[in-house]
């Protein structure tokens, strides 16, 4: 039995879950999300709980069992509470601003980077004096939020010598000493 897959998912108040054909739809105060579920996995909704069951004990079905349980759990958490990620810009002259869903980044290149964010993701930028600028992203869809964060981070990944770049708040960057340390 999959240790993650066998755990039930509780449905909080204000969230409705429906299962039709092979699509699970979760509606809540933060929005609506849908997910395809492989026909080898059975979704049972009863008594305010969601249970996932698999037909056989094949290796692929064991992995799908845990996968779909995690995806549906993320959907339930997303539509009820939502997900939030914070990115920090470390570097001299690094700035971020937004006009609605258009994010403008100044990351030390000769040009500014403009990124149109999906409508499901809300963005807020903070720039305080003597602190690194922050980009705060919120969404009900955890997968989409992670993809957007990693896309922004890929514009200027933190480098190991000075630690400059776009990083998650609280992320530890593995630092290297320079050439002079070997002497």
UniProtKB/Swiss-Prot annotation:
The keyword Metal-binding does not apply. The keyword rRNA-binding applies. It comes from the Bacteria. GO terms for cellular component: cytosolic large ribosomal subunit. Belongs to the universal ribosomal protein uL6 family. HAMAP family: Ribosomal_uL6_B. This is Large ribosomal subunit protein uL6.
């Amino acid at each position: 039995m999959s240790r993650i897959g066998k755990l039930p998912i509780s449905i909080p108040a204000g969230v409705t879950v429906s299962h039709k054909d092979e699509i699970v739809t979760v509606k809540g105060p933060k929005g609506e999300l849908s997910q395809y579920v492989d026909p080898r996995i059975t979704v049972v909704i009863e008594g305010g709980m969601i249970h996932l069951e698999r037909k056989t004990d094949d290796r692929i079905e064991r992995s799908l069992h845990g996968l779909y349980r995690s995806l549906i759990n993320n959907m339930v958490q997303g539509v009820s509470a939502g997900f939030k990620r914070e990115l920090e810009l470390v570097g001299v002259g690094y700035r971020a601003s937004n006009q609605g869903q258009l994010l403008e980044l100044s990351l030390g290149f000769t040009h500014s980077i403009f990124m149109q964010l999906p409508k499901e993701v809300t963005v807020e930028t903070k720039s305080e004096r003597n602190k690194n600028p922050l980009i705060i992203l919120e969404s009900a869809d955890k997968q989409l939020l992670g993809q957007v964060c990693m896309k922004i981070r890929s514009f200027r990944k933190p480098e190991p010598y000075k630690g400059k770049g776009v990083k998650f708040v609280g992320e530890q960057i593995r630092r290297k000493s320079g050439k002079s340390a070997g002497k």
